[in-house]
């Protein structure tokens, strides 16, 4: 939402295209369409559901011997089902950009980057990221200042695919009850008087940062 508002302000609505990419069905697609309508920008819907299904079938056809031999089971790993749609979405975005002669805007922010909460070569990609240096709390302030609807700006971030919010997923991953980006943002900005994590929780956050920081580093070449 905020990146769309920034793009229209910078380039004009006639030069911005919103691309909605459900994986089959997605209940909050109406929110994306609402943003496009409010801004008066062209919108496209590219459903990646059939492509995801076809790719998965093609991959598993070549692995059936391993499944039969018990090396693999028939259950699709969570890492595949979570990250592959994100990469297909980015492929679709670059396809649209190539056809229209445009560029892909990355919508990631600093809060997500600190914890590596993105897919490598998926939603972490893009030509450039206008909000990459800002925390979720700061992005929300920018959105409100631009006049974006408060309910959309304050909406809990989620990928629209796994059925839970980013904060719920991170709370489980970090084993931190009631984890929110707002709480994390105080730590990122070193507002120590506002930080309410325990020492053990901070250590787990730092551990995850060190584990995932490869996603925001320049790729190492030989």
Report each predicted region and the residues it spans.
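ATP/NTP-dependent adenylation/nucleotidyl-transfer catalytic domains that generate, transfer
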Residues: 2-9, 14-17, 24, 37-51, ...
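Short, surface-exposed alpha-helical segments at coil->helix boundaries
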Residues: 1-4, 29-33
């Amino acid at each position: 939402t905020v990146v769309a508002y920034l793009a229209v302000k910078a380039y004009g609505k006639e030069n911005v295209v919103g691309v909605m990419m459900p994986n089959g069905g997605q209940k909050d697609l109406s929110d994306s369409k609402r943003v496009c309508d409010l801004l008066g920008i062209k919108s496209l819907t590219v459903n990646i559901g059939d492509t995801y299904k076809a790719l998965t079938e093609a991959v598993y056809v070549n692995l059936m011997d391993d499944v039969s031999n018990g090396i693999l089971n028939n259950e699709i790993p969570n890492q595949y089902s979570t990250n592959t749609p994100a990469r297909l979405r980015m492929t679709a975005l670059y396809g649209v950009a190539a056809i229209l002669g445009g560029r892909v805007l990355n919508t990631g922010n600093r809060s997500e980057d600190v914890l590596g909460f993105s897919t490598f070569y998926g939603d972490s990609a893009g030509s450039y990221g206008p909000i990459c240096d800002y925390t979720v709390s700061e992005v929300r302030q920018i959105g409100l200042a631009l006049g974006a609807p408060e309910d959309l700006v304050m909406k809990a971030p989620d990928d629209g695919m796994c059925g839970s919010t980013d904060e719920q997923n991170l709370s489980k991953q970090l084993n931190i009850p009631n984890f929110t980006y707002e709480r994390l943002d105080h730590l990122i900005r070193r507002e120590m008087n506002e930080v309410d994590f325990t020492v053990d929780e901070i250590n787990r956050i730092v551990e995850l940062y060190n584990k995932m920081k490869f996603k925001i580093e320049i790729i190492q070449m030989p």
